């Protein structure tokens, strides 16, 4: 009879968990889309935001530098528990105020202030939601969330360019004013779409998990609800990551409520009070050192290379207009080349960032430098084309402009930019996938259930578990600075590189880059 009652009690949770993973995927995809779409809209609107005599690189600089500072400094300075609800609220207000400031201003200074605020929100948002993926109940749900986040950020590139293309006719005030409603979906998604983590936990009950028995001193406390610590035989798919009750996911970092909005019991609060876990500066630096070579340098290199291509080389990849075939339908003016290269790049970034969501296996950790190596080859080949017209047939090699037909180098450049997008997206999603797996609970237990310190797994060191969760949050937050660092370096390289490549083309008799 007791078993029947227990089954009836668990039925609502099992029913509620039916669509929990779908809600999780949708929530993190929306988070990724919202976090990056304003960044793309602002870059797409750069020509309209500054005067003709102001370098457009100023917009790019103010659009990336505050985000970089946030992602570099915040993980090192912040300590203790992360209050995700407050962070989401901060990102919403900061992003909305920034875009409204841009829309309602007509001079350069307040617009740059608004761009900086939007950038600050974007940096804090990426830091927050990447850290949130490490707090989910199982490795499978973390993988789902990370894949959805990556897909959303990838789609933001296509969506942002498309939104501004549709709204540009309304001008800066009208177009950006309409875009200002987008940040309001952050709290809506966080509160109403993101599922309670207990539902995600319930959806994993059919997997070979066992709840970790608590010590008698805790389990005998009538006011104490045992944390749902999940332990299983090590597997490649489902690996428990943390204690959901104590982690920053299940307890929403508010003192009196959990992620489900339920009041915490006195036992929960006492257990939270037991936590003295804080990462010292020395501990953070110890965690950071192995991340630099293993993850941050390869990711930074990928971003330097791809943004040098996008901002420094791609604007000079201009060809005589084709007179037949598909390319003649796409390119009606020399000004059509650069937007097409950008769209191609963004599309393939979206596809590669969605690889985890599409069920493709991640690349092995030892191969994480591979996207950067391939990206360097792509950069080198495109540089040669822009500098020496390496792939052009003799009829299209300057000073000749062809006598009708299609320059074969258009197709080659298109394929190389497709590869560029695949490498960039792959470097991002695979790096954060492997960073998120570091320090999981399963690494601290052997197959017999004994932990690294020789203790029985039936005795739970709550403080140590919570500290492990903080370490995972710090790792993924710290690595997040690598991409913004790469973009900043690329912007410093790209401006003089574009000028030098265009001057070289003009010297050879091809002046199209000056006529755009």
From Swiss-Prot:
It holds the Pfam family CLN3. GO terms for biological process: amino acid transport; regulation of intracellular pH. One of its GO terms (cellular component) is cell division site. The chain crosses the membrane at residues 24-44, 57-77, 88-108, 112-132, 146-166, 169-189, 371-391, 409-429. It is found in: Vacuole membrane. Keywords: Amino-acid transport, Membrane, Transmembrane, Transmembrane helix, Transport, Vacuole. It is a multi-pass membrane protein. Involved in vacuolar transport and vacuole pH homeostasis. Also required for cytokinesis. Belongs to the battenin family. This is Protein BTN1.
């Amino acid at each position: 009879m007791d078993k029947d009652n227990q089954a009836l009690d668990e039925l609502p949770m099992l029913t509620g968990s039916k669509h929990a993973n779908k809600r999780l995927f949708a929530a993190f995809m929306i988070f990724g889309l919202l976090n990056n779409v304003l960044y793309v809209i602002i870059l797409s609107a750069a020509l309209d935001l500054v005067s003709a005599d102001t370098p457009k690189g100023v917009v790019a600089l103010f659009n990336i530098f505050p985000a970089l500072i946030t992602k570099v400094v915040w993980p090192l300075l912040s300590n203790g528990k992360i209050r995700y609800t407050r962070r989401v609220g901060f990102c919403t207000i900061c992003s909305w105020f920034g875009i409204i400031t841009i829309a309602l201003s007509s001079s350069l200074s307040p617009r740059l202030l608004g761009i900086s605020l939007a950038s600050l929100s974007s940096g804090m948002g990426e830091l927050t939601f990447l850290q949130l993926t490490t707090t989910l109940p199982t490795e499978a749900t973390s993988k789902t969330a990370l894949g959805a986040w990556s897909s959303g950020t990838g789609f933001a590139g296509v969506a942002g360019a498309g939104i501004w293309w549709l709204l540009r006719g309304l001008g800066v005030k009208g177009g950006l004013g309409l875009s200002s409603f987008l940040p309001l979906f952050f709290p809506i998604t966080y509160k109403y779409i993101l599922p309670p983590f207990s539902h995600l936990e319930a959806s994993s009950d059919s997997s070979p998990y066992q709840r970790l028995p608590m010590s008698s001193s805790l389990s005998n406390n009538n006011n104490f609800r045992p944390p749902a610590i999940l332990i299983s035989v090590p597997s490649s798919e489902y690996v428990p990551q943390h204690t959901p009750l104590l982690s920053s996911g299940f307890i929403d970092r508010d003192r009196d409520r959990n992620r489900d909005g339920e009041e915490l019991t006195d036992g929960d609060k006492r257990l939270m009070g037991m936590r003295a876990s804080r990462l010292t500066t020395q501990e953070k630096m110890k965690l950071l050192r192995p991340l630099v070579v293993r993850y941050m340098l390869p990711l930074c290199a990928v971003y330097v290379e791809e943004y040098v291509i996008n901002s420094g080389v791609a604007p000079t990849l201009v060809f005589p207009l084709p007179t037949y075939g598909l390319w003649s339908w796409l390119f009606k003016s020399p000004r059509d080349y650069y937007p097409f290269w950008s769209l191609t790049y963004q599309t393939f970034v979206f596809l590669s960032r969605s690889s985890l969501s599409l069920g493709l296996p991640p690349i092995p950790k030892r191969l994480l430098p591979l996207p950067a190596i391939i990206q360097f080859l792509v950069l080198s080949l495109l540089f040669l084309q822009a500098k020496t017209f390496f792939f052009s047939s003799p009829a299209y090699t300057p000073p000749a402009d062809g006598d009708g037909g299609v320059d074969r180098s258009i197709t080659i450049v298109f394929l190389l930019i497709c590869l560029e997008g695949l490498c960039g997206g792959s470097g991002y999603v695979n790096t954060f996938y492997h960073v998120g797996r570091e320090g999981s609970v399963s690494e601290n237990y052997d197959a017999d259930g004994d932990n690294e310190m020789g203790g029985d797994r039936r005795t739970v060191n709550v403080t140590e578990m919570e500290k492990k969760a903080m370490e995972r949050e710090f790792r993924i937050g710290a690595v997040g600075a690598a991409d913004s660092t790469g973009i900043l370096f690329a912007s410093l390289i790209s401006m003089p590189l574009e000028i030098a490549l265009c001057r070289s083309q003009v010297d050879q008799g091809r002046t199209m880059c000056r006529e755009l």
